[in-house]
Amino acid sequence: MKVVTIKDSKKETFSNPLFTGSDVTRQVLIPDSRELVATVVNFGKGVRNKFHSHDCEQILIVTAGRGVVATEKEERPVTLGDVVLIPAGEKHWHGSVGEPFSHIYVSKSGSKLTQLED
């Protein structure tokens, strides 16, 4: 068993063309898992990711702030304690809408992300 405390996890800049701004950091929680990825993503005010999809399910667990998780059909506000299941292949985005926002994402290790928006 391994227990990780989020506040003790190293925060690093998360530069990626998937994001609409540069104020994004991440904290990899379980780097030695063979099957799962569990990472905290911290979005600065107004930063989100662009429309994308995954080839497996993704779970988001909101840990701070208020944000939005959106598909082509709807935008849902989310806040501390909300848990979101995004099915494989669903076009979506998530991020901050006016204040800093953080979530943990959990997905299958080695899964493929496809960016669907420039």
Report residues per predicted region:
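Short, conserved beta-strand element in jelly-roll/cupin
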Residues: 42-44, 53-69
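Short, charged/polar surface micro-motifs in flexible loops or helix N-caps
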Residues: 33-36, 43-47, 66, 109-112
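Short beta-strand His + acidic residue motifs that chelate non-heme Fe in jelly-roll/DSBH
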Residues: 49-51, 69-70, 91-98
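Conserved short histidine dyad/triad with adjacent acidic residue
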Residues: 23, 39-53, 88
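A short, N-terminal "cap"/entry segment at the start of jelly-roll beta-barrel domains
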Residues: 1-36, 115-118
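Short acidic-glycine-tyrosine-enriched beta hairpin
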Residues: 73-88
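Ligand-binding loop in jelly-roll beta-barrel domains
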Residues: 88-113
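Short hydrophobic/aromatic-rich beta-strand segments that constitute the beta-sheet cores
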Residues: 26-27, 38, 69, 103
